[in-house]
Amino acid sequence: MEFLSKIVRVHIPDYLNSVPVPDSFGGFLDLTAGQWLHLFAFSGTVAAAVYMSVKPYLDKKDQKDQLVNLRIQKESSKVVNMVDIEDLGNKVCYCRCWRSKKFPLCDGSHAKHNEDTGDNVGPLVLKRKDV
Protein backbone atom coordinates (compact mmCIF):
# COMPACT_ATOMS: atom_id res chain seq x y z
CA MET A 1 0.00 0.00 0.00
CA GLU A 2 2.96 2.28 0.64
CA PHE A 3 3.97 1.84 -3.01
CA LEU A 4 0.57 3.06 -4.24
CA SER A 5 0.57 5.91 -1.73
CA LYS A 6 4.00 7.06 -2.95
CA ILE A 7 2.85 7.01 -6.57
CA VAL A 8 -0.28 9.05 -5.84
CA ARG A 9 1.30 11.52 -3.39
CA VAL A 10 4.79 11.95 -4.85
CA HIS A 11 5.29 10.72 -8.41
CA ILE A 12 2.07 11.93 -10.05
CA PRO A 13 2.34 15.48 -8.61
CA ASP A 14 6.03 15.62 -9.60
CA TYR A 15 5.14 14.53 -13.14
CA LEU A 16 2.29 17.04 -13.42
CA ASN A 17 4.57 19.84 -12.17
CA SER A 18 7.12 18.92 -14.84
CA VAL A 19 4.62 19.21 -17.73
CA PRO A 20 5.64 22.38 -19.61
CA VAL A 21 2.36 24.29 -19.77
CA PRO A 22 3.08 27.97 -20.55
CA ASP A 23 1.27 30.82 -18.79
CA SER A 24 0.12 32.36 -22.09
CA PHE A 25 -0.38 31.37 -25.73
CA GLY A 26 2.81 33.22 -26.60
CA GLY A 27 4.68 30.93 -24.22
CA PHE A 28 4.14 28.01 -26.61
CA LEU A 29 6.57 29.67 -29.03
CA ASP A 30 9.32 29.55 -26.41
CA LEU A 31 9.08 25.77 -25.78
CA THR A 32 12.03 23.61 -26.80
CA ALA A 33 11.67 20.42 -28.87
CA GLY A 34 12.00 18.29 -25.72
CA GLN A 35 9.30 20.28 -23.97
CA TRP A 36 7.01 19.94 -27.00
CA LEU A 37 7.56 16.18 -26.98
CA HIS A 38 6.76 16.02 -23.27
CA LEU A 39 3.62 18.13 -23.81
CA PHE A 40 2.46 15.99 -26.75
CA ALA A 41 2.98 12.76 -24.81
CA PHE A 42 1.02 14.13 -21.86
CA SER A 43 -1.76 15.51 -24.09
CA GLY A 44 -2.01 12.23 -26.01
CA THR A 45 -2.29 10.23 -22.80
CA VAL A 46 -5.01 12.51 -21.43
CA ALA A 47 -6.89 12.47 -24.76
CA ALA A 48 -6.75 8.66 -24.93
CA ALA A 49 -7.99 8.31 -21.35
CA VAL A 50 -10.87 10.73 -21.95
CA TYR A 51 -11.80 9.04 -25.25
CA MET A 52 -11.84 5.55 -23.72
CA SER A 53 -13.97 6.70 -20.79
CA VAL A 54 -16.48 8.58 -22.99
CA LYS A 55 -16.67 6.21 -25.98
CA PRO A 56 -19.36 3.88 -24.57
CA TYR A 57 -21.71 6.86 -24.36
CA LEU A 58 -20.96 8.28 -27.82
CA ASP A 59 -22.11 5.50 -30.14
CA LYS A 60 -25.82 5.19 -29.43
CA LYS A 61 -26.35 4.33 -33.11
CA ASP A 62 -24.34 1.12 -32.69
CA GLN A 63 -26.59 0.10 -29.82
CA LYS A 64 -29.65 0.73 -32.02
CA ASP A 65 -28.18 -1.49 -34.77
CA GLN A 66 -27.82 -4.32 -32.27
CA LEU A 67 -31.58 -4.71 -32.23
CA VAL A 68 -32.61 -7.64 -34.38
CA ASN A 69 -36.12 -6.48 -35.24
CA LEU A 70 -35.97 -2.85 -36.36
CA ARG A 71 -39.50 -2.38 -37.76
CA ILE A 72 -41.80 -5.44 -37.83
CA GLN A 73 -44.80 -5.40 -35.45
CA LYS A 74 -43.04 -3.10 -32.96
CA GLU A 75 -46.35 -2.49 -31.15
CA SER A 76 -46.32 -6.15 -29.98
CA SER A 77 -44.26 -7.26 -27.01
CA LYS A 78 -43.32 -10.45 -28.90
CA VAL A 79 -43.64 -11.31 -32.60
CA VAL A 80 -45.07 -14.80 -33.11
CA ASN A 81 -46.24 -16.23 -36.43
CA MET A 82 -48.21 -19.46 -36.54
CA VAL A 83 -48.19 -21.50 -39.76
CA ASP A 84 -50.35 -24.56 -40.34
CA ILE A 85 -48.12 -27.35 -41.61
CA GLU A 86 -50.86 -28.42 -44.02
CA ASP A 87 -50.61 -25.02 -45.77
CA LEU A 88 -46.95 -25.53 -46.66
CA GLY A 89 -46.17 -26.36 -50.27
CA ASN A 90 -43.16 -28.40 -51.34
CA LYS A 91 -40.73 -25.72 -50.16
CA VAL A 92 -41.03 -22.48 -48.18
CA CYS A 93 -38.41 -20.01 -46.91
CA TYR A 94 -38.86 -18.03 -43.69
CA CYS A 95 -36.99 -14.84 -42.87
CA ARG A 96 -34.48 -14.86 -40.00
CA CYS A 97 -32.94 -11.41 -40.54
CA TRP A 98 -36.15 -9.42 -39.87
CA ARG A 99 -35.53 -7.25 -42.96
CA SER A 100 -38.01 -8.97 -45.33
CA LYS A 101 -40.83 -6.90 -46.82
CA LYS A 102 -42.93 -10.12 -46.96
CA PHE A 103 -42.21 -11.13 -43.33
CA PRO A 104 -42.43 -13.92 -42.11
CA LEU A 105 -41.55 -15.18 -45.61
CA CYS A 106 -38.05 -14.49 -46.93
CA ASP A 107 -37.62 -12.12 -49.88
CA GLY A 108 -33.80 -12.21 -49.98
CA SER A 109 -33.30 -9.04 -47.91
CA HIS A 110 -30.67 -10.88 -45.86
CA ALA A 111 -28.24 -10.55 -48.79
CA LYS A 112 -28.10 -6.75 -48.40
CA HIS A 113 -28.09 -7.07 -44.59
CA ASN A 114 -25.12 -9.47 -44.80
CA GLU A 115 -23.27 -7.16 -47.19
CA ASP A 116 -23.85 -4.10 -44.97
CA THR A 117 -23.02 -5.71 -41.63
CA GLY A 118 -20.67 -8.60 -42.47
CA ASP A 119 -23.23 -10.99 -40.98
CA ASN A 120 -23.97 -14.42 -42.47
CA VAL A 121 -27.68 -14.87 -41.76
CA GLY A 122 -29.86 -16.79 -44.21
CA PRO A 123 -33.44 -18.02 -44.41
CA LEU A 124 -35.01 -20.98 -42.68
CA VAL A 125 -35.90 -23.35 -45.52
CA LEU A 126 -38.61 -25.96 -44.95
CA LYS A 127 -38.90 -28.62 -47.65
CA ARG A 128 -41.01 -31.73 -47.93
CA LYS A 129 -39.05 -34.95 -47.98
CA ASP A 130 -38.85 -36.57 -51.41
CA VAL A 131 -40.41 -40.01 -51.17
From Swiss-Prot:
GO terms for cellular component: endoplasmic reticulum membrane; mitochondrial outer membrane. Residues 1-35 are lumenal. Its cofactor is [2Fe-2S] cluster. Binds 1 [2Fe-2S] cluster. [2Fe-2S] cluster binds at residues 95, 97, 106, 110. It is found in: Endoplasmic reticulum membrane. Residues 59-131 are cytoplasmic. Keywords: 2Fe-2S, Endoplasmic reticulum, Iron, Iron-sulfur, Membrane, Metal-binding, Transmembrane, Transmembrane helix. This is CDGSH iron-sulfur domain-containing protein 2 homolog A.
